[in-house]
Regions:
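C-terminal regulatory/interaction module of P-loop NTP-utilizing enzymes
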Residues: 1-86, 91-370
Length: 370
């Protein structure tokens, strides 16, 4: 139960939509109510089965010469408060037309003509269609917009909760990742998908599996953000596993997790701070993944500093090239790929790296030298 609680708070910090699966009466709604209370967030509960599609797309209202899609009161309340949790309960009891109307809310946080504030989090709960009253399979486009988490409390969990109280979320508040951490995680996931391109998008054939987590470019990006947020909060492997599988499904999630574990790479931000002092891996695949992450972090830092701190941007530029120079001594092909990427983000007025002679062949490939 603690693993799921931690995964839930990390997904909230990552601003990712969450879908909680569990049997009827297992306490999903009670847990989300406790979560909102412990995190001091306003909570709006919306049960899809008792709403019409217009409750999510907005009710058309004629205003002079235009039509305004008026949002419902629950959306207006969230907008007024500026933050909160929108809890879409009993999702699999909502008919397909209502599920389709929810798509824009989950992905864009837009209800009619109203855009919900960035600090509104979206959580849904669903019973498996086989046990839901008048249940429907979750539509694949809607399912592919969530991190899927399984709520399966054991008898011991329930007994302990009754006797000693259920776990609180007050001690599990998570922080959001910074841009460099997200860039590094996306690079690692992208490098994995280069090795396993068959897993970029795998749409299940059966409706029941299509209503669960499965790989797509969207869910791989969600997986990368979840991994970055886990790193930012020092989460354990069990939490990362839960989130990865919740994003892309068991098969792809376990394979990606195994690949990431085998990489065992140093922190790319640490390497940028000390380009000559951190040992680099020898294996080509690990070296490629690490150098790609270093360049991704460098590009992120350049974008953040170039406009207002040219000295810091130039220093990041110089250090990134020093790392590439180290790699070029043993694996020039890997260095060439990184050089081509870094060269596209040269800060205005930044000098060429001091390692020019050593890097000359690489720089020519990157178009920095004739």
């Amino acid at each position: 139960m603690i693993t799921l609680h931690s995964a839930l708070t990390i997904a909230i910090a990552a601003k990712l939509p969450i879908l909680l699966w569990g049997a009827p009466g297992s306490g999903k709604t009670s847990m989300i109510t406790a979560l909102a209370h412990d995190l001091d967030l306003p909570l709006e509960v919306v049960v899809g089965s008792i709403h019409e599609p217009s409750d999510f797309t907005g009710l058309p209202v004629v205003r002079e010469t235009t039509t305004w899609f008026a949002p419902p009161h629950w959306a207006e309340r969230l907008a007024e408060q500026g933050r909160g949790i929108l809890f879409l309960d009993e999702l699999t009891t909502a008919p397909p037309a209502v599920q389709a109307a929810m798509l824009r809310i989950v992905l864009e946080k837009t209800v009619g003509h109203l855009r919900l504030p960035p600090h509104v989090r979206i959580i849904a709960a669903a019973n498996p269609p086989s046990v839901a009253a008048d249940g429907w399979d979750l539509a694949a486009p809607l399912a592919n917009r969530f991190i899927h988490l399984q709520w399966q409390p054991t008898a011991a969990d329930i007994a302990t909760g009754f006797i000693s109280g259920f776990p609180r979320f007050t001690s599990l508040k998570a922080v959001s990742p910074n841009a460099a951490q997200i860039a590094a995680a996306k690079t690692h996931i992208g490098t994995f998908l280069r090795v396993r391109p068959q897993l970029v998008s795998v749409i299940p054939d059966s409706p029941d599996l299509a209503g669960q987590a499965w790989p797509s470019p969207r869910t791989w990006e969600m997986a990368a953000i979840a991994v970055a947020t886990s790193w930012a909060n020092g989460a354990g492997e069990d939490v990362i596993t839960t989130l990865l599988i919740g994003a892309v499904g068991e098969a792809a999630g376990f394979e990606a997790l195994s690949w990431l574990k085998n990489l065992d790479l140093p922190d790319p931000q640490t390497i940028l701070r000390d380009p000559d002092g951190v040992a680099l891996p020898i294996e080509v695949d690990r070296l490629h993944a690490l150098l790609s992450a270093v360049v991704a972090v460098a590009v992120t830092e350049l974008a953040e500093t170039a406009a207002h701190d040219s000295d810091a941007a130039w220093e990041t530029w110089r250090r990134a090239w020093r790392v590439i120079a180290r790699v070029a001594r043993t694996t020039p092909d890997v260095a060439a790929t990184a050089a081509q990427s870094l060269a596209q983000h040269r800060p205005a007025g930044a000098p060429l790296p001091a390692e020019l002679l050593e890097l000359a062949p690489i720089l020519r490939r990157a178009g920095l030298m004739p």
